[in-house]
Amino acid sequence: MSYSLMSRKIKTVISFKIESRFEEWVKIFDSKEADLRHSEFDIKPLFRGFSKDDPKKIICIHQSPKGNIQKFFQANSEWIKSHKFDFSTMEESSEI
């Protein structure tokens, strides 16, 4: 496998539910601390919003090297849980 394919960034769509309101959650997502945590894993948030049918369902699109989203969640799971993120509702899909 060539290096260029291994280092290629992929787009990942993640959806999940939150217990708080979107306005509260987005303040955390847009914070400097979240930016630093994302940058540690070379994750670039491209979009964050909520479902028009369910304002507690969040949809995020990120760009990162393959596998980095999973590494981010493993390294930051307690921090993420503290922001009322329901891991049991998380769905993820990726494209290269």
List each language-model region with its residue ranges.
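Short S/T/G/P-rich N-terminal loop/turn motif that feeds into the first structured element of a domain
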Residues: 1-96
